[in-house]
């Protein structure tokens, strides 16, 4: 590999570090007016958003009692509840406000310890990190209609909600309107809400349906640039909309609006999400908003308002919406998208720019996992398959390297012949390559090939919940987390965690697998002819060390992939070079290195 190709190799490697490793450091229409009415009646503080004079502030939402901090248990006990129990979730529904505000996940725990607490997703208002969803109706501007509010207590026809037994809630406003709400849940994470309003009064009533998901307090995020956490949604036929919490806070009036037919919107964390989903054929006005309660607690909301409907005396109107609250399982989201027709619901997972590679990579890993029962083994097999697919390119690359080695004496002669004329050296070198049919850049093809695979596998390991707490062998119990061992505490002999040190802790996550990766990369470098340029030689010598420190804090599944890929690359290169009759540099370079150590 000549100077030019080595420069390209170096540039690609350092670009990989910059892009991946350092990412750690990082007058409205009627429906609009109906939304404003809903905003004022559902938890929005006065004075920060336009108000509808026809809809009074819901004082019950911000009483001094509610402003007092509560434990989650105290907040749950503050309202009558209806039990929720499915194969995937457990919790309760608040009959006060008919809110879905208590959901925990049966199949997921906080740590790899099977006795650790279940993941708590939704919590009631007043609890720390309140997070809930609700749906209902709001009156049109100028309409003095008593619709259910957050302090309305509904009656239920049963005491538990299960996949086999939907529940129907009822509220009579005493003014001729009777509200019915049927709530059903499937065996995963989807709630279906069917609202109806009977108008038994003597005059028509105009209402609009809405649904929202809200969370109080700024959520804890992992703060990786390669992963989106915050507001997310697909409205109409547009692409996915993603906004961080602080981005919406900085918007004019603290909100951003969208319009279209169907879609979904809500909040996404790394592995969990809560979204509201309208009828996919209905036009909606959607909004992301950020605000604060009178006590200073930040509140974030994703909501939509449907078309305004006029209900004649004796008539009934209906509205349907859904709430997704659970784990972002790939097969579950795909099934909802296909079976329920939810637009682009798979994009609730942040697949990234390399979607066209990341999704196939996940499918391949999942298929191999179904055969082996171990995602770590699936990663090893997937690497072999990728190597096999690109073997023709790798073969061409290594043969080109062999040819370059063969003409190395001629290149050295050109440097001696034109020691002061760099331009002439370059011209004669390129002419030599042309005569010998050598492509100096082709030697970098193996590196170029593995970069998109690296990104795709990194995304799969980092964002898909299927990789969370997936074990390998030995001490690796979670492929999505860094190697738990650490060189700097002598692999657990010293009672401290070097990764918790400020500023430098992230770069001290040097476990067994990162060390193996560094060694394998060093060996791979030594499999190539050493560069003539002293500076390049130093850079390539230190590159394995840089990668070891940088990738040490990455998911160990990615480090295992990189290590295995290096081993396969060295084996592949050795085989191809021997078949081409070219001497393999690896053993001579390693021997030369140790001779220098002994001599010094």
Swiss-Prot record:
Pfam families named in the record: 60KD_IMP (PF02096), YidC_periplas (PF14849)
UniProt keywords, alphabetically: Cell inner membrane, Cell membrane, Chaperone, Membrane, Protein transport, Transmembrane, Transmembrane helix, Transport
InterPro entries: Membr_insert_YidC, Membr_insert_YidC_N, YidC/ALB3/OXA1/COX18, YidC/Oxa/ALB_C, YidC_ALB_C, YidC_periplasmic_sf
Bilayer-crossing regions: 8-28, 374-394, 445-465, 503-523, 539-559
GO MF term list: membrane insertase activity
Membrane topology designation: Multi-pass membrane protein
Record GO biological process: protein insertion into membrane; protein transport
Places the protein is found: Cell inner membrane
Gene3D superfamilies per UniProt: 2.70.98.90
One GO cellular component term noted in the UniProt record for this chain: plasma membrane
Chief location bin: membrane
Disordered: annotated span: 36-60
Listed Polar residues bias regions: 37-60
Entry-linked CDD domains: 5TM_YidC_Alb3, EcYidC-like_peri
Subunit note: Interacts with the Sec translocase complex via SecD. Specifically interacts with transmembrane segments of nascent integral membrane proteins during membrane integration.
Family (UniProt): Belongs to the OXA1/ALB3/YidC family. Type 1 subfamily.
PANTHER family in alphabetical order: CYTOCHROME C OXIDASE ASSEMBLY PROTEIN COX18, MITOCHONDRIAL, OXA1
Functional note: Required for the insertion and/or proper folding and/or complex formation of integral membrane proteins into the membrane. Involved in integration of membrane proteins that insert both dependently and independently of the Sec translocase complex, as well as at least some lipoproteins. Aids folding of multispanning membrane proteins.
Stated name of the protein: Membrane protein insertase YidC
């Amino acid at each position: 590999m000549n100077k030019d190709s080595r420069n390209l190799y170096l540039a690609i490697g350092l670009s990989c570090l910059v892009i991946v490793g350092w990412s750690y450091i990082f007058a409205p229409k009627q429906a609009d007016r109906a939304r404003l009415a809903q905003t004022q009646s559902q938890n929005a503080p006065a004075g920060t958003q336009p108000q509808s004079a026809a809809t009074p502030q819901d004082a019950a939402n911000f009483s001094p009692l509610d402003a007092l901090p509560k434990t989650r248990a105290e907040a749950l006990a503050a309202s009558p509840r209806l039990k929720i129990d499915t194969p995937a979730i457990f919790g309760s529904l608040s009959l006060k406000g008919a809110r879905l505000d208590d959901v925990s996940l049966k199949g997921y725990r906080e740590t790899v310890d099977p006795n650790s607490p279940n993941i708590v997703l939704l919590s009631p208002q007043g609890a720390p990190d309140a997070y809930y969803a609700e749906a209902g109706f709001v009156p049109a501007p100028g309409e003095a209609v008593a619709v259910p509010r957050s302090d309305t207590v509904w009656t239920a026809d049963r005491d538990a909600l299960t996949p086999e037994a939907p529940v129907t809630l009822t509220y009579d406003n005493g003014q001729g309107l009777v509200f019915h709400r049927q709530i059903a849940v499937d065996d995963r994470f989807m709630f279906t809400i069917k609202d109806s309003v009977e108008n038994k009064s003597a005059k028509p009533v105009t209402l609009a349906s809405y649904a929202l998901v809200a969370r109080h307090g700024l959520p804890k995020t992992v703060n990786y640039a390669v992963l989106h956490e915050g507001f997310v949604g697909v409205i109409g036929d547009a692409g996915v909309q993603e906004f961080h919490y602080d981005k919406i806070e900085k918007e004019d009036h603290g909100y951003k609006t969208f319009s279209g037919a169907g879609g979904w919107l809500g909040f996404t964390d790394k592995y969990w999400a809560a979204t509201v989903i309208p009828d996919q054929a209905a036009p909606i006005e959607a909004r992301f908003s950020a605000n604060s309660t009178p006590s200073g607690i930040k509140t974030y909301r994703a909501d939509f308002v449907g078309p305004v409907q006029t209900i004649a005396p004796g008539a009934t109107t209906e509205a349907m919406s859904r709430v997704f609250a659970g784990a972002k399982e790939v097969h579950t989201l795909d099934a909802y998208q296909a079976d329920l027709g939810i637009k682009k619901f798979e994009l609730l997972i942040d697949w990234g720019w390399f979607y066209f590679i990341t999704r196939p990579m996940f499918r391949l890993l999942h298929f191999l996992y179904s055969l082996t029962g171990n995602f770590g083994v699936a990663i090893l097999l997937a690497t072999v398959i990728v190597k096999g697919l690109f073997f023709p390119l790798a073969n061409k690359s290594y043969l080109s390297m062999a040819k370059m080695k063969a003409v190395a004496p001629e290149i050295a002669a050109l440097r001696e012949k034109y020691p002061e004329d760099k331009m002439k050296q370059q011209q004669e070198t390129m002419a030599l390559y042309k005569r010998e049919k050598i492509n100096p850049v082709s030697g970098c093809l193996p590196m170029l090939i593995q970069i998109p695979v690296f990104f795709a596998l990194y995304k799969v390991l980092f964002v898909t919940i299927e990789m969370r707490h997936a074990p390998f062998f030995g001490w690796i119990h979670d492929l999505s987390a860094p190697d738990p061992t650490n060189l700097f505490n002598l692999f657990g002999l010293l009672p401290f965690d070097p990764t918790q040190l400020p500023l430098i802790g992230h770069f001290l996550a040097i476990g067994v697998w990162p060390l193996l990766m560094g060694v394998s990369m060093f060996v791979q470098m030594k499999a190539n002819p050493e560069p003539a340029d002293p500076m390049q030689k130093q850079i390539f010598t230190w590159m394995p060390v840089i990668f070891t420190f940088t990738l040490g804090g990455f998911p160990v599944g990615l480090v295992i992939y990189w290590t295995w890929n290096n081993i396969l690359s060295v084996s592949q290169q050795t085989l191809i070079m021997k078949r081409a009759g070219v001497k393999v540099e690896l053993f001579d370079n390693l021997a030369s290195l140790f001779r220098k150590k002994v001599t010094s």
